[in-house]
Amino acid sequence: MSFENAVIGATASSLANIAVYPLDLAKTLVQTQLKDEFVEAGEEAGEERAGSRRQNRIKPIALRSPQAAEQYKGALDALQRIYGAEGVAGLYRGLGSSTVAGFIQSFSYFFWYTLVRKHYFRLKQARGGDARFSTPEELVLGIVAAATSQLFVNPINVVATRQQTRGQAAGAADMRTVAREVHAENGWRGFWAGLKVSLVLTVNPSITYATYERLREALFPTPAAASHLVDSAALLSPGQNFVMGVLSKIVSTVLTQPLIIAKASLQRSGSCFQDFHQVLHHLYSTEGPLSLWKGLGPQITKGVLVQGLLFMFKGELTKMLRKLMFYLALLRSSRRALKG
């Protein structure tokens, strides 16, 4: 059952991410760009800039490549300029590695989440206590599953983010080429850039799924045994799953947006940030506290669409799989009857 849930969850997640990939690309570019006033490239990086009103407060951040300083007014501007310069293909640069990373991460997450949740549920039943999970329990179960999956997928996430943020000047590159660039610049350690903040961000899907379960129990209550032994998404209609997914993702995104920005900034092409504390400090010092939530609009739009589609696809794929298994069982039974 854990393997089936993992395959269904990963497939649903991949389909949802492919559907909104251009928006994901745009929000990554918007989130990782720095203001011109605080960006320099080449040997002048780190020196005070003449005429800058803040030259005594902050030093510019060095970037390894000129395209890393490209500025966009917003997600729509990014999409229009990428399409104008690179065509439709430009809107899907990095799609392959991003889809692979998403599938592996989702598969691992759903596998461990289902497995841990099922065994913990049985343990609670054996002790004779309330079989329902509390919100803290849902969060802990989700964090354990997400942290485990992140260990496997971080290197692919680094490659995917670099492909997204290379820019037209650097040219398109496949996964192998980008992986070689990462290794040449930072060795094997480069593939684990942003791992710490990624582990901290494991609270994001945990908040999402805990919120989903709480909303489902409040708005669409079901018997305790059914809701914990059966995939919750399969108990609701596609529309209900979509609404629950959207609401739960809004909550988790608003709470974790600063960490999402820090992770993307660490993994982007041309970044010289060393850790997520440096990213957050730089953004707060140079652009103010609201910069920690920049790109929140496209992040929420992308996130809620993906989460809504994910729960909808997951619920429908689960129902399809069960129907298929039922028909196969009937077919086997009829064959035995004919042989008998």
Curated annotation (Swiss-Prot):
Principal location listed in the UniProt entry: membrane
Coiled-coil residue spans: none
Chain ranges passing through the membrane: 6-26, 96-116, 139-159, 190-210, 242-262, 293-313
Subcellular location: Peroxisome membrane
SUPFAM superfamilies associated with the record: Mitochondrial carrier
Keywords, sorted A to Z: Hydrogen ion transport, Ion transport, Membrane, Peroxisome, Repeat, Transmembrane, Transmembrane helix, Transport
Organism superkingdom: Eukaryota
Function statement: Adenine nucleotide transporter involved in the uniport of ATP and adenine nucleotide hetero-exchange transport between the cytosol and the peroxisomal lumen. This transport is accompanied by a proton transport from the peroxisomal lumen to the cytosol. Transport of ATP into the peroxisome is required for beta-oxidation of medium-chain fatty acids.
Protein name: Peroxisomal adenine nucleotide transporter 1
Annotated gene: ANT1
